[in-house]
Amino acid sequence: MSESTEAPTPAPGHVREHWNELAEEVRQHQFRYYVRDAPIISDGEFDVLLGELNDLENQYPDLRTPDSPTQLVGGGFSTDFASADHLERMLSLDNVFATDELRTWISRVEQETGPDLHYLCEVKIDGVALNLVYENGRLDRAATRGDGRTGEEVTLNARTIDDIPEKLTGTDEYPIPALLEVRGEVFFRLEDFAALNAALVEEGKAPFANPRNSAAGSLRQKNPAVTARRRLGMICHGLGRSEGFEPVSQYDAYTALAAWGLPVSTHTARVTGADAVVDRVQYWGEHRHDVEHEIDGLVVKVDETSLQRRLGSTSRAPRWAIAYKYPPEEATTKLLDIRVNVGRTGRVTPFAYMEPVTVAGSTVSLATLHNGSEVKRKGVLIGDTVVLRKAGDVIPEVLGPVVDARTGDEYEFVMPTHCPECDTPLAPAKEGDADIRCPNQQYCPAQLRERVFHVAGRGAFDIEVLGYEAATSLLEAKAIGDEGDLFSLTEDDLLKTSLFRTKAGGLSANGRRLLDNLDSAKDKPLWRVLVALSIRHVGPTAARALAGEFGSLARIRESSVEELAAVDGVGGTIAAAVAEWFGVDWHQQIVEKWSAAGVRMEDERDESIPRNLEGLSIVVTGSLETFSRDQAKEAILIRGGKAAGSVSKKTAFVVVGESPGSKHDKAVELGVPVLDEDGFRRLLEGGPDAVAESGV
């Protein structure tokens, strides 16, 4: 009995027509991305279009022609630079977007090769592909990917990148090959990208929207001196043709590249089996912002090169490698309007009101624009298609407009001259301020709502039931006049608002919880009281420093600006803001109301805890077994130390837990002492001398 060999159904006319339109749209976006460095849609939106095209071709295989965008690499090359042929074709990578898709790929690979393979997992750099050719150890030429066979020669520009050696070094184990073709990614380190944009703004020029586009534009400058000033980086991640070297594995290839003086990623891991691969995907999904450059996924490669050869390639991508793509952190959407919000300190902030779009795994329709000057600097108009970015837990940000998408119907935003809530004339707090404020601080309804809501925030009293709706309800029902009345609330007060009243007229469960939470909050430490008072510039860090130095609100109030400014972590601006706040009568009334209601206004110092970390900057990275992140921070602060968020030459110690990320690498690079959890405990108990004695 023979198997059926029935031919696949050809695509109907309307499907073929749709395929043609979609393929042309994808080609245009490829051209704008790879050649012009001026995309008008996000990477995520492009992936959706390409995925739709691929799905059509899977359903109707006769649509999959050799010139389909799904079968080609890159977007060709422009005529601005001389063309350069690659010695071996530069392929792209196929993508997966979910762990079950990744496991399916691994299962398919292991059906052909056998189980429990070794895989090399490395972060996927969001940069620009570059091909380097070395002859007898000297850089001969550099070219962009282009269409995978031919790219643009950018040798002079590549020579200006510090990471790219002009001459290779050799070792006994890895002598220099006669010919070596190396593939890698050119990128911007995030701190260098920020510095570049700051310099462009200072020169009155438009900043770049993102590091990837700026890296592409910088690499393709006609004047190499401009490229040199841009401080690009490069990391190598593969080989093309070579004479005199044949790696046994991907890991072996990377070891050789490093021995020759070529840059390789420190964010790689050689693992066995699907579960370990998925673990790496999840780890870097949580730590993608710990890397010095942008990443948009994890690349998984079969490690053994003999198996790579057995698996082979399609016309566009190797079958032995896959890219797991994380949810895109940038998207394009329509800017429907620009509105303003009045904050708790009176600051009037414009914000973007947009068509909802999914970015970084969540739906976003609002994003801050900071102030009127920032709106002008970004050059956004109402009606623009804009690039939106949301990185992890960071507040969504409008990066700028897609100028090429303008229709002529867009129009400029004008900042209001009067408060939209209380109609008070707006003005900067002082001459030269970029922000404008509503000076009606005590009575402006918007500021009142925001201040009451702020009292309950995680950085302040952390009162769960007191959300924005509750704050609004309490004020509108006149259950409170301002935040000063919160800790005196009674059951009768809460019954004035329907939010805390049952249908039968009694106090709801949430009302009871609010009263209980307010009562518990009265014993919170002094630094939380300081944060809750809505003093300009005083966040948890400055509040902890002030509370640690003075111990009571009375002592802080009585201190001079000079005494306040002398506290480590405070400084002149914060000191002046604190002194100014306590000089306002109605502010004093809030403090008096809270004190009368039983809110603790001073800390009880535990004299048994030594101040043995005075002046030391300590960074904690990774997960500790016996300390939460907040507990570790508190333990450092209570001993007089500073719990820093980044590693520098001034860092005294870096405490490393499980999965520490790039801060550990930075510490090693700078020679900063690294402690494990046991070392951290010794440091807390005995200070720096205790860890010095143990040989750290």
UniProtKB/Swiss-Prot annotation:
Enzyme Commission numbers on file:
6.5.1.2
Cofactor(s) listed in the protein's UniProt record: Mg(2+); Mn(2+)
Catalytic activity line of the entry: NAD(+) + (deoxyribonucleotide)n-3'-hydroxyl + 5'-phospho-(deoxyribonucleotide)m = (deoxyribonucleotide)n+m + AMP + beta-nicotinamide D-nucleotide
Keyword hit for Signal: no
Record domain BRCT: where = 608-696
Q: Which residues form the active site?
A: K124 (n6-amp-lysine intermediate)
Which molecular function term from Gene Ontology is one that the record holds? Answer: DNA ligase (NAD+) activity
**Where is NAD(+) annotated to bind?**
D43, G44, E45, F46, D47, S92, L93, E122, R145, E185, K301, K325
Q: Does the record carry DNA damage as a key word?
A: yes
Positions binding Zn(2+) in this chain are C419, C422, C438, C444
Query: Which processes are annotated in GO (biological process)?
Result: DNA repair; DNA replication
Against Pfam families, the record matches this protein to: BRCT, DNA_ligase_aden, DNA_ligase_OB, DNA_ligase_ZBD, HHH_2, Nlig-Ia
Lineage: superkingdom: Bacteria
Q: What does the UniProt keyword field contain? A: DNA damage, DNA repair, DNA replication, Ligase, Magnesium, Manganese, Metal-binding, NAD, Zinc
What function is annotated for this protein? DNA ligase that catalyzes the formation of phosphodiester linkages between 5'-phosphoryl and 3'-hydroxyl groups in double-stranded DNA using NAD as a coenzyme and as the energy source for the reaction. It is essential for DNA replication and repair of damaged DNA.
Family membership noted in the UniProt record? Belongs to the NAD-dependent DNA ligase family. LigA subfamily.
Q: Which NCBIfam families does the UniProt entry name for this protein? A: dnlj, PRK07956.1
Name-wise, this protein is DNA ligase
What is the scientific name of the source organism? Answer: Rhodococcus jostii (strain RHA1)
